[in-house]
Swiss-Prot record:
Entry binding sites for ATP: T10, F11, H18, G91, L92, R93, E101, Y126, A127, F128, I129, S130, S131, S132
GO annotations of cellular component type: cytoplasm
EC nos: 2.7.7.3
Listed HAMAP family: PPAT_bact
Enzyme kind, highest EC tier: transferase
Subunit structure: Homohexamer.
Subcellular localization, as worded in the UniProt entry: Cytoplasm
Pfam families: CTP_transf_like
Cysteine disulfide links: none
Protein name: Phosphopantetheine adenylyltransferase
One example of a Gene Ontology biological process annotation: coenzyme A biosynthetic process
InterPro entries assigned: Cyt_trans-like, PPAT, Rossmann-like_a/b/a_fold
Length: 164
């Protein structure tokens, strides 16, 4: 059956940094499931509803045959078990990401010892991109087309137009 990996996140919205990691992960694993967290932590209320984030991710990732996009509401390790995945993929943009990601990986290992966490770093041109920065630039009327898929840029423009 091959190796199944899960790449979890809020993807609020999905950026070129995410898609870079997903494309590279798709080459490493037989099946890569992009797990969109439907209920992220209360301190991280999403700007886009889960249905919108799923649609934008599917649009941005169209054409990558071994990638699926699915929402999840459970603990990540339960989502991993449900899909019989062996690997969790996480991205590291900078050294500052490492401490938090290391803690998450350690907790996941305590909860499910048979699942490995693999860290990937983005291509240099994407290392500074984050969903929150993209949302902020868009909210202030900036052009985010270099950082996201055209459908995402349009969704952000539409969101800005709705805000009084």
């Amino acid at each position: 059956m091959g190796v199944t990996a899960i790449y979890p996140g809020t993807f609020d919205p999905i950026t070129h940094g995410h898609t870079d990691l997903i494309q590279r992960g798709a080459r490493l694993f037989d099946r890569l499931i992009v797990g969109v967290a439907a209920n992220p932590s209360p301190s991280k209320a999403p700007a886009f509803a889960v249905e919108e984030r799923l649609e934008l991710a599917r649009t941005a990732l169209a054409g990558i045959d071994n990638v699926e996009v699915e929402a999840f509401t459970s603990l990540l390790v339960d989502f991993v078990a449900h899909h019989e995945a062996q690997v969790i993929v996480r991205g590291l943009r900078a050294v500052s990401d490492f401490e938090y990601e290391f803690q998450l990986a350690s907790m996941n290992r305590q909860l499910r010892a048979d699942v490995e966490t693999v860290f990937l770093t983005p291509a240099e041109q994407y290392a500074f991109i984050s969903s929150s920065l993209v949302r902020e630039v868009a909210a202030l009327g900036g052009d985010v087309s270099r950082f996201v898929h055209p459908a995402v840029a349009e969704a952000l423009r539409n969101r800005v137009r709705r805000v009084p």
